[in-house]
C-alpha cells in the first residue's frame, strides 16, 4: 500500500481526478492530509486564508526517548550549536577503530546524526549547519563529538513541535534592500497595500557565508590547513507563501 498527497486549485479537476483514479485501482480518499511520511500537518482555514504548519514532533519525541533524554528539562531558548565550543576544535578520538568503546560510539553517533539529518532536511532548517559540522566526524567520532550531537538532541527535545509554516496571504519579508520594508508591511506604512496573490506566490531567496574558520582565530600566511577545518560555510534559504521551501547549510568545497 502506498500513500500519496494530491491537490488542485479547481474542485472540478480534483473531483475528476478522484473519479478516474477510483476506476483504475482501489483507493481510499482520506480528506485533508494530517500525517504524511511522519510529518504532521496542522491546518487553520478561514474565509480569507489557508494556513498550515508542518512538524515532525512524533519522530522528534521518539528520537529523544531512544537516547533516554525525555526527563531532561526543556530549554526552548537554546540553540543547536554550543556557543564558544566549535565542533571543529573538539579533540579527535584516541581510541582504536576496533575498540569496543569506539565501535559503540560510532554506531550511536551515526544513528543520531542520520536522524538529525532527516529532521533538518524535512522541517527543521534551523539545524542544518550543526548537522553539516557533525556529519564530518561520522567515521571516527570522539566523545566530544557525541556530546555535541547530544546537545543538538537536547535542543530537539526542547523544540520538538517546531517546524515550518505556510499561508496563502503572506508575502516574503524582503525582496531586495531597496524595497525593504515591502509596501505590504502595515507596521511600516500607514497606507500599506494588502498583499495580493502575486505577492504571496513570489519566491524569495537569501544566501550568506561565513568567511573562514569557525575556530575564530587567524593563521599565518602559508599555513597548511587541516582537512575539514578553516573552510567557510555556505547558507541559503528560499521562501514562498511565508515559509521555507528549500535550504542548505554546508561547508564550501
What are these model-derived regions, one by one?
Residues 29-57, 84-89:
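Short, conserved secondary-structure transition motifs
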Residues 1-26, 42-55, 136-144:
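Catalytic palm subdomain of template-directed nucleic-acid polymerases
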Amino acid at each position: 500500500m502506498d500513500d500519496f498527497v494530491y491537490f488542485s486549485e479547481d474542485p472540478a479537476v480534483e473531483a475528476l481526478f478522484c473519479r478516474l483514479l477510483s476506476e483504475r485501482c482501489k483507493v481510499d480518499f482520506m480528506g485533508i492530509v494530517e500525517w504524511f511520511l511522519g510529518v504532521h500537518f496542522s491546518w487553520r482555514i478561514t474565509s480569507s486564508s489557508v494556513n498550515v504548519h508542518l512538524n515532525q514532533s512524533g519522530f522528534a519525541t521518539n528520537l529523544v526517548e531512544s537516547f533516554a533524554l525525555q526527563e531532561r528539562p526543556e530549554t526552548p531558548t537554546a540553540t543547536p550549536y554550543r556557543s564558544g565550543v566549535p565542533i571543529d576544535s573538539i579533540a579527535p578520538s584516541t581510541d582504536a577503530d576496533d575498540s569496543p568503546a569506539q565501535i559503540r560510539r560510532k554506531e550511536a553517533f551515526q544513528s543520531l546524526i542520520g536522524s538529525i539529518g532527516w529532521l533538518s532536511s524535512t522541517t527543521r532548517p534551523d539545524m542544518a549547519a550543526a548537522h553539516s559540522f557533525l556529519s564530518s566526524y561520522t567515521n571516527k567520532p570522539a566523545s566530544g563529538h557525541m556530546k555535541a550531537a547530544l546537545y543538538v538532541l537536547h535542543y530537539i527535545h526542547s523544540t520538538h513541535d517546531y517546524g515550518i509554516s505556510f499561508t496563502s496571504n503572506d508575502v516574503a519579508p524582503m525582496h531586495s534592500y531597496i524595497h525593504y520594508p515591502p509596501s505590504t508591511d502595515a507596521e511600516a506604512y500607514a497606507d500599506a497595500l494588502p498583499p495580493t496573490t502575486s505577492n504571496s506566490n513570489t519566491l524569495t531567496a537569501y544566501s550568506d557565508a561565513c568567511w573562514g574558520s569557525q575556530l575564530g582565530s587567524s593563521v599565518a600566511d602559508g599555513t597548511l590547513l587541516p582537512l575539514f577545518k578553516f573552510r567557510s560555510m555556505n547558507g541559503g534559504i528560499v521562501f514562498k507563501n511565508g515559509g521555507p521551501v528549500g535550504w542548505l547549510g554546508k561547508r564550501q568545497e
